[in-house]
Structures are given as C-alpha cells and as structure tokens.
Amino acid sequence: MSIIKEFKEFAVKGNVMDLAVGVIIGGAFSKIVDSVVKDLIMPVIGVLTGGLDFSNKFVLLGTIPPTFKGNPDSFKDLQAAGVAAFGYGSFITVAINFVILAFIIFLMVKFINKLRKPEEAAPAATPEDTVLLREIRDSLKQR
C-alpha cells in the first residue's frame, strides 16, 4: 500500500474528521464563552467587588531606571520598559477567569446533556447456559 493511500485512509477514516470538526466548532464556541465571561459575568463581578482590578497588582523586583517615562504604578508600563516585576495580579485575574469559564462550560454541557435523548440500553447478552441449551436443541433437531 502506498503512503498516499495510507494517509488518505487515515485522514478520512476514524476520528480524524470528528476531531477536525470538533476543533473548528471549539474555536467558534470559545469566542462565545469568552464573550459571556468578559461581557456578562465580569462586569457583574466588578460591581460586586467595587471595581477591584487585580490585573495591575505586582511586586517590583528590580529598580526603575532613571530613563523610565511611564507610570511607575502601571505593570504594563514597567513590563514594556523591561523592569523586573512579579505580576501576581495578572495571574489572579487569569485564574478567576478560568474558574468562571470552566463553570460556565460545565453548566452549558450539563444543559446540552439534558436536551439529548437518552440512548437506549443495549439488549443484555444471552446467558451462556441458554446458548448451550439452544445448541443442544438444534443438534437434536438435526438427527
């Protein structure tokens, strides 16, 4: 079998196509979930926490050079200038966003699973003794 035929079988058989469709739909779905978190959930959390913003929380690890022209209280300005700073606030913001995002996806999957029709249970396998008795019966009929 040629390499092209093998690749063709690999690409069109099995889960490769399912995976490709899943990745494409996942990319589109992630934009929806990102929008839900950023545009709907985070503003509510901002109101509940009094507008608290963790993204600019940091610990200065180095010294600010005398040529620095940005805001010394801005993590982004310090990063842009190459000043060493431990930006724990950005991590906290990303972690909170992740937890919220994961919870929203969990709720969506749970809702979608409720909408799905339950699969019918596969019929139980015939017990081995019944199969043996049928074989004996069939062999006796043939005599």
Curated annotation (Swiss-Prot):
GO molecular function, one term: mechanosensitive monoatomic ion channel activity
Superkingdom, taxonomy of origin: Bacteria
SUPFAM superfamilies: Gated mechanosensitive channel
Residues spanning the membrane: 10-30, 89-109
UniProt cross-references to Gene3D superfamilies, sorted A to Z: Large-conductance mechanosensitive channel, MscL, domain 1
Localization in the cell: Cell inner membrane
CC annotations in GO: plasma membrane
Membrane topology: Multi-pass membrane protein
Keywords: Cell inner membrane, Cell membrane, Ion channel, Ion transport, Membrane, Transmembrane, Transmembrane helix, Transport
Oligomeric and partner information: Homopentamer.
Protein family (similarity comment): Belongs to the MscL family.
PANTHER family: LARGE-CONDUCTANCE MECHANOSENSITIVE CHANNEL (PTHR30266:SF2), MECHANOSENSITIVE CHANNEL MSCL (PTHR30266)
UniProt function note: Channel that opens in response to stretch forces in the membrane lipid bilayer. May participate in the regulation of osmotic pressure changes within the cell.
Protein name: Large-conductance mechanosensitive channel
